[in-house]
Amino acid sequence: RGLAWAMLGFSEEIEMVESIPEASFSEKNQKADVLKMMLKGAQATCDFYIKNTPVCGIPYWDTGAPGLHKLGDYLARPADPYNDFEPVDSSAAAIGAQGLLRLGHYLKKQGKDDLGAKYWQAGLSIVKSLLSEPYLSTSPNHQGLLLHSIYHHPNNWDYVPSGKSISSGESSQWGDYHFREVILYLHKMLKKETYYTFFSFIDNPNS
């Protein structure tokens, strides 16, 4: 999940820096240099995510999880939240998807259509997975929206269903938050409306 925070963080920071006038930057830290650094970080983290995540776009809780080797060629097939070795983390997928989408959108605006499409389509693929079972909660008896989120696996803070060896089936506040946020982002984009950013209030304090 830390990787996903970085993916989204770099992409959102790029949007913010892009909105700041050139005159606000110093000679030692010019706008183009800051954007170049942020873009390098965004692409590095997003590329790592794409390379080390199963084809459905939903990651296991850690790319270095000790039990992943027991799953065989786990990257070549959809993640299995009900496996017996390592839990998936849908909250990381919700966070990472938004980072991919925002990066893809930025690159397209810069005229890099093919590169932008790579990240945009990866983000859409993740959202498609999250909007389907087993990740989308469809039971009226469950209060969460996004299933198979992880709190802190090493500390054993997660609920393990009866008869199972690893955690599954639960939601988290950050998972549900970022799930809703990425859906709202896409909704705004599809309607060609201004999408929300964390810095929007600077110019529109009442927004």
Task: For the regions a language model picked out, list residue spans one by one.
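Glycan-recognition and catalytic cores of secretory/periplasmic carbohydrate-active enzymes
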Residues: 1-207
